């Protein structure tokens, strides 16, 4: 969809990519064999807590993978990816595009990494690739919500040119609590 289509009032037809590659990283949909590796992240406060992942177990993730993710993807609600290092044959974390709004041409990006994958540019390159795909395919605005105080995630977004737009009170879950989130956004014109 072109920007002129957006101006004419047509709804966006953005489609989530099946997979994306950047350097040695492959962003692809999760498969059953990934669950045992990624499930601990959903219970580890050092990982899941920073990314506001729900504290679920492997059985719940299997059900989500089979029964929920395909429908959510088809409806434009969520495209979940694992981040795989193809050189090391290792899962490093996850990323997502979600909350696609076809009327406003907006999508939200999210990401999380295992502690061992941090500090290597994995989050920055993954978010950049997802953002590039979105803005090259008709998305006018990419948003991200980061728990207030999660400076590592804030730095990822700032490096990529996302602008800090404000704080949403009690917007994210952090364990059993509701916490404030900083809203970041990048416009297609900014890229």
Regions found by a protein language model. Name each.
Residues 111-112, 119-136, 151-159:
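Conserved acetyl-CoA-binding loop-helix of GNAT-fold acetyltransferases
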Residues 1-116, 133, 178-191:
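GNAT-family acyltransferases
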Residues 34, 46, 117, 121, ...:
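Conserved functional loop/turn residues at catalytic and ligand-binding sites
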């Amino acid at each position: 969809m072109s920007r002129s289509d957006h101006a004419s009032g047509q709804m966006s037809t953005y489609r989530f990519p099946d997979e994306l590659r950047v350097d040695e990283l492959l962003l692809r949909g999760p498969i059953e064999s990934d669950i045992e590796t990624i499930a601990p992240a959903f219970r580890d406060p050092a990982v899941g807590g920073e990314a506001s992942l729900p504290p679920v177990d492997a059985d719940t993730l299997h059900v989500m993978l089979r029964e929920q993710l395909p429908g959510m993807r088809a409806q434009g609600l969520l495209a979940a990816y694992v981040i795989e290092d193809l050189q090391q044959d290792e899962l490093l974390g996850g990323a997502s595009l979600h909350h696609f709004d076809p009327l406003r041409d907006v999508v939200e990006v999210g990401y999380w990494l295992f502690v061992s994958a941090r500090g290597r540019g994995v989050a920055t390159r993954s978010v950049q690739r997802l953002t590039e795909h979105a803005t090259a395919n008709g998305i006018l605005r990419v948003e991200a919500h980061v728990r207030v105080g999660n400076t590592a995630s804030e730095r990822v977004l700032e490096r990529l040119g996302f602008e800090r737009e404000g704080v949403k009170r009690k917007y994210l879950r952090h364990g059993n609590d509701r916490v404030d989130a900083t809203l970041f956004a990048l416009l297609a014109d900014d890229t």
